[in-house]
Each structure stands twice: as structure tokens, then as C-alpha cells.
């Protein structure tokens, strides 16, 4: 029976969708990501992604100035010429942001106007007004979909849906070959012209829990079969994922022993996690599979909150969380009161609230980091577990230090 989802009145948006640039420009190596935005957008990308501008990364911001308010459309031709001269991309993604959305910039027409015969400029809606942190990847993949070749009905192969780094992608290809599963490729691939063919015979295996819209389009527009399974996070999710993908291809596999061995290798992490109380506030749409993994690892999940829950796309994860309090669009004021009352051992929270929580004595972890780390599949299980155990170990080491009178020597008592 799936977990009951409680819907509250909190903010749907948690962090700007423009930050999807951080992992996608590294994944699609012949791309350029151009944000039409303000100085605030530029500062966000500069500071959050930690890439100095003189490193010439394959992303940039076309700044909206006051003079642009009176123009019919922003002028981007000169900027596109500079991008082509400096980076020679095969595709440019034009990302919207809050200010031009409010100005009612017609992005579809703008993207078509600045496209070149051999260089498509694709509009990607990524504004924080409409999309939460990780959902902007969904928009990028929807923009790529028309460029995927149409596979014939008898082309029965798997397409993995979602961006993962090259090492994880190689692991998935190797595992598929070991199980006898034919693979057409990944969406997205590392290069624009290598996009996989997708058609009625294609089996789509989602790797990320925030790609519900593009998965739906693949089923509707290409007739592909979208696998409903756990997402491949942790040994439990990875086993279910591969068994379900194999079943969709008509192949019977039993990975119980493989899962048992994977849990054995995680035993040092499990010793730290067992019995811990964990609280998820809402941020990156990865909360459901992360909470499911921790529950299997022996943690008590006090609450698992997410900005958006798709009952169909997340059905298997909700089944695995039966009995857990699951909240959509949570009210953060209520969450703060619950955190103070329930005193969790670990809180998974967004960038805006993690440091204030730490300042109030709460052991907290940035949820943003999970989007950038190689945590998928068998090979990513140790990295995933370590992301939860590190803050717990650090806190355990600091606690005895804070009892040392050296820290308060010579301090006047508070009045």
C-alpha cells in the first residue's frame, strides 16, 4: 500500500532551476548554456557552481539591462557569434529566468530567430517562477526530444533517462551487458549528435526522480514503454531497478545475492545509520528514494517532504515508504516546530535553511549536494551512504570537544 501524501501550503519552489547548468554543461560536452537574466542570475551561477569566469566554462548569462525594457525582444545575435567563435558548440540551450518571464519575452520565437542552419538554439524554460531546482533538467531533455531519431517498432532496446556522469554511465552499460539487456543509449548523451533513437519498441528506464514530464512525453509521442520501478539509489533500489528493466525486456534475473553483498560492503556505514532519526525538508525532488534507502538502512524517517510528488511516476517509491509521513509542499514553519520537538539526529535541508539549522544545534546536510554526486547503481552506493554518515561522524567527533572548558575559558556569562 503506498504512503499517504499530505499536501500543505508551503512554497513549491526551493532553489533556482538555473543551477541545472552545473551538471548538464559537464554532461553534454559540445553544448553551451546561455541564460537570459539579470546580475542576480550571474552571481548565482558564479557563486553556487564555483567556476571562475576566466576558466571559460560553457555557460554564460546575457544580462537584461534597463534599456532592454523598451525593446521588442532582447538582441542576442552578437552574443551567439561570440559563443560560436569561442566554444564551437553543436547546440545552445537558451534558458529563461524570472525577470524576462515577467517581461513576457517570447522565448520560442527568440530561440528560432538566433538559430543557425547547423546550430540549433533550444529554448529551455527554467525560471524559478515555474520550476524547482532539479526540474530544469526535465526541460532540457524535453528540448532534446525532437532531435532523437525515431526508432522502428522492432528496435527493442533500453534508453536510460537522466543525466549521470561518464563513470556511472559506463557502469550502467557494463551491468546491462552482463544481464543481456541491449542498450540504445542515454538521454542525454555526452554529445548532441549521439542522441539515442526512441520509438514504440524502446524501453525507457528513468534514473532520476524529477523527470516525470519528459517520461510522459516519451510514452505519448514516441509510444515508448516507461519502466515503473524504484530509482537506482542504494542496493535495494538498484536491485529492483535492474530486475524491472530486465522484466520489461522479457529477461528474468534474480539479484538477491548481489543486493546482499552490496549491503555487506556498506556495513561500516550501516553501523552509523542504524537507529538514527532522519527528517527531510523539501528541495530537490530526490527525497523519496533517499528516504527509502535510509529506511532500508535502519533509520527512522520522521518525515519525508518534497516540493512535488507525482503519484504515478513515484508510485513504487511511495509503496516502499508505506507508514512514513510523506508531505508535499510542506509548511516550513510547521517543520521547524516539529524539528524542535522531535529532535532528529539528521535533517536533510536546502541551502537556505541548512546553515541556520546548524546554528541552532541541529545536525543538517545540504540536499543540493545529492544532485551533483555519483550516487547511482551498485558503484554509487558507498558514496550515497557516506553522504549521510559524514555529518553524523563529524558531529560525534565535535561533541566531546565542545565539553572542553577551553572553549568557554574567560568568557563572561550571558546576562
UniProtKB/Swiss-Prot annotation:
Cofactor note text: Binds 1 [4Fe-4S] cluster per heterodimer. The cluster is bound at the heterodimer interface by residues from both subunits.
Gene Ontology MF annotations: 4 iron, 4 sulfur cluster binding; ATP binding; metal ion binding; oxidoreductase activity, acting on iron-sulfur proteins as donors; oxidoreductase activity, acting on the CH-CH group of donors, iron-sulfur protein as acceptor
Highest taxon above the source species: Bacteria
Residues engaged in binding [4Fe-4S] cluster: 16, 41, 98
Swiss-Prot/TrEMBL keywords: 4Fe-4S, ATP-binding, Bacteriochlorophyll biosynthesis, Chlorophyll biosynthesis, Iron, Iron-sulfur, Metal-binding, Nucleotide-binding, Oxidoreductase, Photosynthesis
Known catalytic reactions: chlorophyllide a + oxidized 2[4Fe-4S]-[ferredoxin] + 2 ADP + 2 phosphate = protochlorophyllide a + reduced 2[4Fe-4S]-[ferredoxin] + 2 ATP + 2 H2O
Pathway in which the depicted protein is active: Porphyrin-containing compound metabolism; bacteriochlorophyll biosynthesis (light-independent)
Names of required cofactors: [4Fe-4S] cluster
Principal EC category: oxidoreductase
Gene Ontology biological-process entries: light-independent bacteriochlorophyll biosynthetic process; photosynthesis, dark reaction
This enzyme's EC code(s): 1.3.7.7
Function: Component of the dark-operative protochlorophyllide reductase (DPOR) that uses Mg-ATP and reduced ferredoxin to reduce ring D of protochlorophyllide (Pchlide) to form chlorophyllide a (Chlide). This reaction is light-independent. The NB-protein (BchN-BchB) is the catalytic component of the complex.
Oligomeric form and interacting partners: Protochlorophyllide reductase is composed of three subunits; BchL, BchN and BchB. Forms a heterotetramer of two BchB and two BchN subunits.
Family according to the record: Belongs to the BchN/ChlN family.
Protein name, UniProt field: Light-independent protochlorophyllide reductase subunit N
Organismal lineage: Bacteria, Bacillati, Chloroflexota, Chloroflexia, Chloroflexales
Amino acid at each position: 500500500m503506498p504512503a499517504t501524501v499530505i499536501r500543505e501550503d508551503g512554497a513549491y519552489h526551493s532553489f533556482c532551476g538555473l543551477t541545472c547548468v552545473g551538471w548538464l554543461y559537464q554532461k553534454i560536452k559540445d553544448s553551451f548554456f546561455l541564460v537570459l537574466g539579470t546580475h542576480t542570475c550571474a552571481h548565482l551561477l558564479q557563486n553556487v557552481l564555483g567556476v571562475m569566469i576566466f576558466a571559460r566554462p560553457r555557460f554564460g548569462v546575457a544580462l537584461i539591462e534597463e534599456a532592454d525594457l523598451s525593446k521588442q525582444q532582447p538582441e542576442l545575435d552578437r552574443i551567439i557569434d561570440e559563443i560560436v567563435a569561442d566554444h564551437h558548440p553543436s547546440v545552445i540551450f537558451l534558458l529563461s529566468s524570472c525577470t524576462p518571464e515577467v517581461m513576457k519575452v517570447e522565448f520560442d520565437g527568440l530561440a528560432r530567430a538566433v538559430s543557425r542552419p547547423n546550430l540549433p538554439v533550444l529554448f529551455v524554460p527554467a525560471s524559478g517562477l515555474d520550476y524547482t531546482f532539479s526540474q530544469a533538467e526535465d526541460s532540457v531533455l524535453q528540448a532534446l526530444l525532437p532531435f532523437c531519431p525515431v526508432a522502428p517498432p522492432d528496435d527493442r532496446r533500453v534508453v536510460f533517462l537522466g543525466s549521470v556522469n561518464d563513470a556511472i554511465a559506463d557502469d550502467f552499460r557494463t551491468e546491462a551487458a552482463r544481464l543481456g539487456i541491449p542498450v540504445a543509449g542515454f538521454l542525454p548523451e555526452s554529445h548532441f549528435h549521439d542522441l539515442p533513437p526512441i520509438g514504440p519498441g524502446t524501453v525507457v528506464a528513468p534514473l532520476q526522480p524529477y523527470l516525470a514530464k519528459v517520461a510522459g512525453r516519451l510514452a505519448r509521442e514516441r509510444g515508448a514503454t516507461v519502466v515503473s520501478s524504484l530509482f537506482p539509489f542504494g542496493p535495494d533500489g538498484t536491485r529492483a531497478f535492474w530486475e524491472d528493466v530486465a522484466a520489461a525486456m522479457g529477461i528474468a534475473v534474480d539479484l538477491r545475492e548481489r543486493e546482499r553483498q552490496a549491503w555487506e560492503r556498506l556495513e561500516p556505514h550501516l553501523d552509523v545509520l542504524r537507529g538514527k532519526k532522519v527528517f527531510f525538508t523539501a528541495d530537490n525532488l530526490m527525497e523519496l528514494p533517499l528516504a527509502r534507502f535510509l529506511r532500508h538502512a535502519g533509520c527512522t524517517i520522521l518525515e519525508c517532504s518534497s516540493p512535488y510528488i507525482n503519484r504515478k511516476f513515484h508510485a513504487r517509491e511511495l509503496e516502499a515508504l508505506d507508514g512514513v509521513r510523506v508531505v508535499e509542499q510542506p509548511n516550513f514553519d510547521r517543520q521547524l516546530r516539529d524539528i524542535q520537538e522531535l529532535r532528529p539526529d539528521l535533517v536533510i535541508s536546502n541551502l537556505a535553511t541548512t546553515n541556520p539549522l546548524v546554528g541552532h544545534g541541529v545536525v543538517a546536510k545540504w540536499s543540493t549536494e545529492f544532485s551533483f554526486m555519483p550516487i547511482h547503481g551498485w558503484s554509487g552506493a558507498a558514496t550515497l551512504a557516506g553522504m549521510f554518515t559524514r555529518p553524523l561522524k563529524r558531529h560525534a567527533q565535535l561533541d566531546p570537544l565542545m565539553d572542553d572548558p577551553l572553549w568557554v575559558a574567560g568568557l563572561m556569562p550571558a546576562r
